[in-house]
Amino acid sequence: MARGCDTLFAESVLAVQRRCPELRLVAMIPCPSQPDAWPEADRARYSRLLAACSEIRVLEPSYSDGCMLRRNRAMADAAALLVTVYDGGPGGTAATIRYARQKGKQILPLWY
């Protein structure tokens, strides 16, 4: 989970989960140190979300080059549908959308 849309989607899942308890929130964490440089308020929000997850998958024991990309690919591999918020610029979201398309994943763009 990252700041921004990932956090908003996670909070939305938890809100819907109150009415639909079979819904699960699974966090894909690239490495345990992911939030270390974030502002305190964001780290606290992240901790609350992790505590509410049905499952937490930590992909690597420590930060390394490419760990965010590998996390994004793991999320795409695990997803039946990718819901994307994307501004058209280069970066991790663009790479993940390209990867998902190559894998034949269904993509629902909310903003493109």
Language-model features, listed with the residues they occupy:
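Acidic/glycine-enriched connector segments
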Residues: 1-112
